[in-house]
Amino acid sequence: MHILVTNDDGIHHPGLAALRDGLARDHRVQVVAPDRERSAIAHAITLLTPLRAFSQTNGNGIPSWAVNGTPADCVKLGVLELLGEKPDLVVSGINPGPNVGVNLNYSGTVSAAREAALLGIPAIAVSVSNPYGTHFSDAARFMQDLVADVAERGLPKGVFLNVNLPDVPMEEIAGVRICRQGIARLEEAFHVRKDPRNQPYYWQGSETQLFGESPDEDGVALRENCIAVTPVQCDMTDYGFLNQLKEWKVEKP
């Protein structure tokens, strides 16, 4: 199978290297990834400046390009221009730090997989729970098996998989849980400081993760030491509310 590997942490990140090398054992792999860290950039694409792709070399001879754009740019440019042919699958990761709950909306890792799904290509985003991830090889081993399942069974149109693994040795993981996107999110916080001119500036972020309680949520599964596998759809329409909204009879003024 022909696989495009990408991420949002940059082409030299060890998580990408573990994923690339693991998948290359059984598949034809090419890499198109950002030339630098582009985390939490969501589904941004570059329209006002040109994109540039620089061919990279690595010890295993896998064709690779570093792009001065976003993760979504990398998928779009790779599929439409760089690879020469449409890949069978796009895999984004391995991201250090979880992408569960509300944080799917901010994630460049997840958005790269979403871009592939929008282009009609099956895709998987994969992350480990630790922002300073150390068990990328275990995650890559799991992905080899999951990729084989996707190759055999396929994915519905407009749907991709979001995978989160505990950052522990594989033998310590409790199991695999198929689950829904939950409500987990980082606790909202800004750290206010002063610059040398006594003007305030703000660092956004917190490492406190707020989880739900339902065992079928992705964040709860991860907290309970399970691998969380979630099907995510690109169509964001709320069909349950659609007909109710039509009853509002909204009209132009």
UniProtKB/Swiss-Prot annotation:
Enzyme class: hydrolase
Gene: surE
Protein name: 5'-nucleotidase SurE
Residues engaged in binding a divalent metal cation: D8, D9, S39, N95
Family indicated by similarity: Belongs to the SurE nucleotidase family.
GO MF terms held by the record: 3'-nucleotidase activity; 5'-nucleotidase activity; exopolyphosphatase activity; metal ion binding; nucleotide binding
Cellular component aspect of the GO annotation: cytoplasm
Key words, A-Z: Cytoplasm, Hydrolase, Metal-binding, Nucleotide-binding
Cofactor descriptive note: Binds 1 divalent metal cation per subunit.
Organism, as annotated: Desulfatibacillum aliphaticivorans
